[in-house]
Amino acid sequence: MADIIGGEVVTELVRQLYAVSQKTLRCRGIAKNLATMIDGLQPTIKEIQYSGVELTPHRQAQLRMFSETLDKCRKLTEKVLKSSRWNMVRQLLHVRKMENLQSKVSSFLNGQLLVHVLADVHHVRADSEFRFDRIDRKVDSLNEKLGSMKLRGSESLREALKTAEATVEMVTTDGADLGVGLDLGKRKVKEMLFKSIDGERLIGISGMSGSGKTTLAKELARDEEVRGHFGNKVLFLTVSQSPNLEELRAHIWGFLTSYEAGVGATLPESRKLVILDDVWTRESLDQLMFENIPGTTTLVVSRSKLADSRVTYDVELLNEHEATALFCLSVFNQKLVPSGFSQSLVKQVVGECKGLPLSLKVIGASLKERPEKYWEGAVERLSRGEPADETHESRVFAQIEATLENLDPKTRDCFLVLGAFPEDKKIPLDVLINVLVELHDLEDATAFAVIVDLANRNLLTLVKDPRFGHMYTSYYDIFVTQHDVLRDVALRLSNHGKVNNRERLLMPKRESMLPREWERNNDEPYKARVVSIHTGEMTQMDWFDMELPKAEVLILHFSSDKYVLPPFIAKMGKLTALVIINNGMSPARLHDFSIFTNLAKLKSLWLQRVHVPELSSSTVPLQNLHKLSLIFCKINTSLDQTELDIAQIFPKLSDLTIDHCDDLLELPSTICGITSLNSISITNCPRIKELPKNLSKLKALQLLRLYACHELNSLPVEICELPRLKYVDISQCVSLSSLPEKIGKVKTLEKIDTRECSLSSIPNSVVLLTSLRHVICDREALWMWEKVQKAVAGLRVEAAEKSFSRDWLDD
């Protein structure tokens, strides 16, 4: 398969098409459409490549014909890029040829040939057991990944995992620590890596919790010399204490073979580096190594030594000078103690931290801008909290717990709630805000301020999608991460006391069943306000009855393609926020959804990677639901029924988010009957072509976000009748070529984002947008908006850097 359609060839072709769209005005729309269509093929091509199944001659011939079409397209883009933009005759000729190629590619896609090829692959694999180094990979995962796991830029979720360590930190950066104690370690590990090709294939970094192992590993993954040595073939993965080894192994195998000819071919000895962070056991490591692939080096990062001691770097604690410099960076934003401040106090606090980077950062942030008198109390608390056994890890725990004493109750509770989420996973900021809003009756902005405060204290990290550059448009673009030691502290503090009396009932890691401790104590009610359950597949028989009369937040994490909801939800009369997240590879079917009939107080519902249950006219309305988020879901026919009145089922809905739902074709017109809707966010839904014509009924709508809806070709003119609309995002809607002519009637519009659209002109009425304060556009469209800027006082026009990039795939 790789001989027929090469993944790197397709990647390069997409790059060239985007380059053409920027250079040649006449080819812009066609080139962008072609790039989107061809780019969307890549996950499917990779699935076929990795399957290891030999295609029939007939299928190979069909794919070879398509490959020839792509090759013609590549040659044409090269000609366009080399041609002069002033040669109009040649440009017209190129446009016609490109239109012809677009027709051929579209015909291929409409025929859904690749889907049939995948079906062939599945039939073959169903008849013979697929083995590769003792892996049993699920056959249906390929089909599910193909349709359901697309991310911005049409990337599959599997490949998107590679971005986990490439995010841009908003509040704190690990890079600030480098040069403070890590340079030596970086140099030593690089020496071992560069020699590894001669013998050792497994290199190690070990050290205690909070010593900076992950920071060092991240920096090595970004290091130019390391990337150059391995030809930019570097993969960083976090394994964690309860890993999905099958999924991780499939991901590593895909990475190792993506540069080669295919599964069954002989692989040349090109260098590749796989960095495995937070590995807990040798058994896990053994299952994630591919010793039979030449040129592969594995760098394992763990608390214990899992590699030979000769090629393991033990992360050293910081000496007094290094520790003082890191501490001062955290508290004073400089490496030295400021003149006039007590050197003695700084020395005492640094001494209590015993050279531990995490302690120095967290404690330093807690003392920022505090008077010296406060520092004296901090020294006393740190000294008092030091545990008797003097182990480094328990000392870190005690020191962090001491800093939490100074947090106000809501901020401290927010920190403790983070223990409800799985280890080493990015937490969508939207989810965390929803939980805090319901627990403490906060406004969204106030909840966000609490989270930022924790970030300023180095108790969590805010990260945003790297493909947005320095700008972001909503909470959905931002995620929360937390050091595993900090999460352990949150769990430890939450699990004090008898299980029935805990305010937070949490499972520390994924288990096959509910904790035995819960079952032994289920003869009396639980007082928990927050309940978090993390399992695999659950059937009706796996649940036992629980009384949770005070529970306001329920978070269900699982990894399976089917899942029976816990029956005790029906008795949770105070439940206001429900989060259901499937971490598996394919959307799950939920069973016993009828329990929702008793959730009268539910205000926030987050569904991720599940099949949305079918709604009908008999569905019991969720009278108080304010926020509904459908992420990576299969909509199926849930919203397509003409007789279904969505407004009756969700009468008070104010915030609707639908993201990465690739089978969403349209929004039902009855959704416009929800007069309380304040925000609609439809993002990364490539098949939706139009919006309801009766949008003007949404009198409360302030935010309309339509990011990366590639087939959306127009905005309804009714949008001009929305009396409160403030923000419109149509970025990466590549088929959208114009704004409504009467857009100037939206007097309340304050911000519009048009990045990577195909706008060739803007209506004259735009100058009437007197409230417009911010426009984000491409550099090529800057001249159009600068004319508007002269007519609209106070308008700021910002040209965004291109977010389209494939460099992050190598991270």
Swiss-Prot record:
Belongs to the disease resistance NB-LRR family. Residues 180-242, 312-437 form the NB-ARC domain. LRR repeats lie at residues 650-674, 676-699, 700-722, 724-746, 748-769. The keyword ATP-binding applies. One of its GO terms (biological process) is cell surface receptor signaling pathway. This is Probable disease resistance protein At5g04720. One of its GO terms (molecular function) is ATP hydrolysis activity. ATP binds at residues 207-214. The LRR repeats probably act as specificity determinant of pathogen recognition. Keywords: ATP-binding, Leucine-rich repeat, Nucleotide-binding, Plant defense, Repeat. It comes from Arabidopsis thaliana. SMART domains: AAA. Residues 1-147 form the RPW8 domain. It comes from the Eukaryota. Probable disease resistance protein.
